[in-house]
Amino acid sequence: MEPEALETCPYNPHHRIPLSRFQYHLASCRRKNPKKAKKMASCKYNACHVVPIKKLEEHEAACVNKSTMEEEDSLSPLKVSLPNAGQKGNRNASPVSPRLPNPDLWNVDSTNCHPMFVLKSFIPQKLVCESDTRESETDDHNPIPDCPRRRSSDRESEPPAEDTSLLKA
């Protein structure tokens, strides 16, 4: 088994981290070094590329992951930009050409015109426990008339008995 490639931490050059753990280490080291973190910025093409803010534009122009992001952007579904108000009067302006989706993307709907899902308001209904229903049925058909069963709902509705012995004193 080959050893995994090690990356150098931008917050502390003495830290050498395996690539598989690098994102976790960056988050941890960023929290532990807030002063240094204020001077650093993440690349928009790869969050593991953390560079000084002054060198960010230079890095993003030459970033190795830039081409990957541009390819993914070209594979995105149909995008149409509407002309702005300044272009409405200009008839010589070229028509807006929508970006067509890649035909290899079979799991994306090409029309992309689904109605927006809106959750309708929830109306709560009275919930009934099955055991309560069975208990009330057995109360109605009690085979022993000498021993009437009381439902727990009957006990809750009765007011508590008052102790009048304390009132006489």
UniProtKB/Swiss-Prot annotation:
Gene Ontology MF terms in the entry: protein-containing complex binding; zinc ion binding
UniProtKB keywords: Metal-binding, Repeat, Zinc, Zinc-finger
Biased composition (Basic and acidic residues): 131-158
Zinc fingers typed CHHC U11-48K-type, residue spans: 6-33, 40-67
Keyword Ligase found: no
UniProt key word Zinc: yes
Binding residues for Zn(2+) 2: C43, H49, H59, C63
PANTHER family on file: GAMETOCYTE SPECIFIC FACTOR 1-RELATED (PTHR21402), GAMETOCYTE-SPECIFIC FACTOR 1-LIKE (PTHR21402:SF3)
Official protein name in the record: Gametocyte-specific factor 1-like
Gene that encodes the chain: GTSF1L
